[in-house]
């Protein structure tokens, strides 16, 4: 059998979705969906996730310990713009700190800007289905 070797620049990593792991984002359509009785069989909620938003340093340390050099993460629009035109600068600064910690750990961030969840206010305006919403 011929020996196979990965390229030295191969990306080994982790991929996550913010709605599933971050916790604390109550301004998205998925949060509202989870609050509707009967939508989730056991009644659980995505609101807490696994608290990655607050425990990211521990998570990134574990990734590094496992030999990961890449992390595909998402940025939930609803966390950064919870109301139309109103940006949460504290959340933006926190996300910047997360990216800086990844850099410190020499883990390459691969950013997903749209991972299905949208702000509730956007959906109520008709979301992507209304031409006037798209600039």
Model regions: which residues?
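Substrate-binding cleft and catalytic face of glycoside hydrolase catalytic domains
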Residues: 22-25, 60-135
